[in-house]
């Protein structure tokens, strides 16, 4: 089932809008003939998502879940569709159910954290981001997700720590270095910001890409 999640995610954008519409039309006819075929419904929902037909996708995932309440693909992507429609309570419910079944799914945890942020639940989102770091201590993205939220909340000291941890795990990611430099510039710590940029250049980032931030260090 998790392989299906990867397959669906990777196939996004592989077809044109017209091809997706043709696929959905064909699948509608197949579903009419085989209404209990969950694979057909998942494939149609994928087409609906790629056409941004969120309500239709949610309807298909509902059919799937009525037959298989623990279908991970349906839960995960229905949560995504609910998020697109700003149905945050329903998105949260689907992510919670998904994570009860598959508690160590990185993208689902990030999806839940995003929903909690949209709902304005500051304490819960920080708890979720802390959990993500605990579950995935080797993931640069885990630290970066927490750092981004801390930066937004102006929790600069802890954000700097998390950006450092993200950089340590993925030193080639220039966005992490720039994010750290942005905080240092906001704190008027220009020398440290420049050192952060210099370190990124030493790791292989072309200096020209960082000109905007170097100029602000003067």
Regions found by a protein language model. Name each.
Residues 38-39, 72-73, 106-107, 140-141, ...:
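Helix-start (N-cap) detector for alpha-helical repeat units in TPR-like alpha-solenoids
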Residues 18-23, 182, 186-218:
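Terminal, low-structured helical/coil segments at or just beyond the last alpha-helical repeat
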Residues 17-26, 52-63, 84-97, 119-131, ...:
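Structural signature of tandem alpha-helical TPR/SEL1-like repeats
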Residues 33, 67, 101, 135, ...:
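Structural marker of alpha-solenoid helical repeat scaffolds
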Residues 1-7:
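Bacterial N-terminal signal peptides
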Residues 49, 76-83, 117, 144, ...:
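Position-specific recognition of the canonical hydrophobic site in helix A of tetratricopeptide repeat
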Residues 8-55, 59:
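N-terminal leader/linker segments that initiate helical-solenoid repeat arrays
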């Amino acid at each position: 089932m998790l392989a299906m999640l990867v397959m669906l995610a990777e196939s996004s954008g592989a077809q044109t809008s017209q091809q997706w519409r043709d696929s959905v039309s064909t699948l509608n006819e197949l579903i009419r003939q085989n209404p209990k075929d969950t694979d057909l419904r998942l494939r149609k929902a994928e087409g609906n998502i790629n056409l941004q037909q969120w309500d239709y996708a949610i309807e298909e995932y509902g059919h799937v879940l009525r037959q298989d309440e623990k279908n991970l693909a349906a839960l995960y992507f229905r949560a995504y569709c609910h998020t697109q429609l700003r149905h945050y309570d329903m998105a949260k419910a689907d992510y919670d159910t998904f994570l009860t079944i598959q508690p160590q799914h990185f993208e689902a945890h990030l999806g839940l954290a995003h929903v909690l942020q949209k709902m304005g639940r500051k304490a819960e989102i920080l708890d979720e981001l802390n959990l993500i770091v605990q579950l995935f201590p080797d993931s640069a993205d885990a630290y970066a997700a927490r750092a981004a939220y801390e930066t937004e909340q102006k929790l600069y000291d802890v954000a700097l720590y998390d950006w450092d941890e993200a950089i340590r795990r993925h030193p080639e990611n220039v966005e992490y270095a720039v994010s750290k430099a942005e905080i240092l510039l906001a704190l008027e710590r220009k020398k440290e910001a420049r050192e952060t940029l210099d370190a990124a250049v030493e790791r292989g980032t072309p200096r020209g890409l960082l000109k905007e931030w170097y100029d602000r260090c003067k």
